[in-house]
């Protein structure tokens, strides 16, 4: 191809136009997106990231943030050490104005120590461990419910809903608490044990295991020997799959499993387990199969998700991250500035009633930075899908008494 003088003159003539357009476009605001995008938590991390990505795309379509487009800078935090390294890179190389994330408690626990020292706002959308917001940090804010609420709901579901459905005294049931041994599992299980004590329920086992374990046969054997009727299980996808596989291999299952989010929420888990997970209960973030009167806009988010990614959502983690990100992006807009103290003041001044977001949550933040109007819901796997069964205002199906194939 010959590069003619006419073509060259055209390029020269066009250059001022391109330059003027570039100068007319405001610089994008870089926002950090810190999630586990590889490793054992990658599926849940990616599903969570998609919610943030949708919220940012909506904000940009509506004119951006503070008159500028938002640019997401991704960081892969597959373990706490990597989370620290990635958040430093996001601040030093990408010059992010804030960090959004992160799904897992150990990751945000580590990364937020770095951002707090630097005075960079950190908006947590999905890690539930209570201690995350109990360290006296000024610039860490969390939109989602906490582990204590998950623990309370899982136990109350047995006491107030499941036992009456079975026609038995809840105190006659043998409950077992099973959890992975990191921040997520330890926190949820601690609140479960405390709630069981308060209600006088019979806990026959309280077992922990490493999330990277490859053998849970001894766990299954102890649960079988204890005669557990209900297992309250807190775990990630790989260990949930392992637990189900070894229950099947050993020919045992409890009368019911009640999950606390994590791996119990994923459509991929249900697809892999098959009919064995039918009827399993799960306390978690709002899922897409919800009465929209309680979660206005949830179905619109699902439609946008399917259009953007060409598939159905894998869990409600995308919805939770979307709702939280929209909330915090609106806060930044109202603050009128990226100044950390103005952002903190705007967060603490936020006052939205329950049902004001697509996840059905409201927004009112305490001095610790925790949203006190975010609550989990109770779901059940029915016909291969996870549907909301409690609270009644959000339910799209009735609670069923049976579990398993």
Regions found by a protein language model. Name each.
Residues 305-318, 329-388:
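Segments of small-molecule ligand-sensing domains
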Residues 19-35:
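C-terminal segment of N-terminal export signals and the immediately downstream linker at the start
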